[in-house]
């Protein structure tokens, strides 16, 4: 009996990530419920944004957060070079806003947004916002981990938009 066989639970799919198991690995990662954010920045061509669920707090002092865009994204170069960006945490009723930023295109058309002191587009009315200066960027496989020093933050009461198993949902308080 192998160690893996010894710790396997009934109805559990045990696998080694990679290759033919990439879908199983994605499904396992999808079991972890995340919040949903829209990250924005400015390029010479104008504002840019993308929907992201790879957001986390790093440090309270100094205030640091991180997110990690995929290198395969056509927007990766713009975000990995941006010196400033804003991370918007979406509320449970903002799934349509999330969808606007899942593809390249005209996400800012007919959208209420402003420019902050650093020239970054900010979207009012989100559940929380973190306006950041890039503190570091780290190569991490097929993604880049971007660490931001939070210059300003905003927050309002409300329920977050959640993402799990490939679907949006709401957080249910117990």
UniProtKB/Swiss-Prot annotation:
Record's catalysed reaction(s): FMNH2 + NAD(+) = FMN + NADH + 2 H(+)
One Pfam entry name: Flavin_Reduct
Entry EC number(s): 1.5.1.42
InterPro entries given in the database record: Flavin_Rdtase-like_dom, NADH-dep_flavin_reductase, Split_barrel_FMN-bd
Role description: Part of the sulfoquinovose monooxygenase (sulfo-SMO) pathway, a D-sulfoquinovose degradation pathway that enables the complete utilization of all carbons within sulfoquinovose (SQ) with concomitant production of inorganic sulfite. Catalyzes the NADH-dependent reduction of FMN. FMNH(2) is then transferred to the sulfoquinovose monooxygenase SmoC.
Family the UniProt entry places it in: Belongs to the non-flavoprotein flavin reductase family.
Protein name per UniProt: FMN reductase (NADH) SmoA
Organism: Agrobacterium fabrum (strain C58 / ATCC 33970)
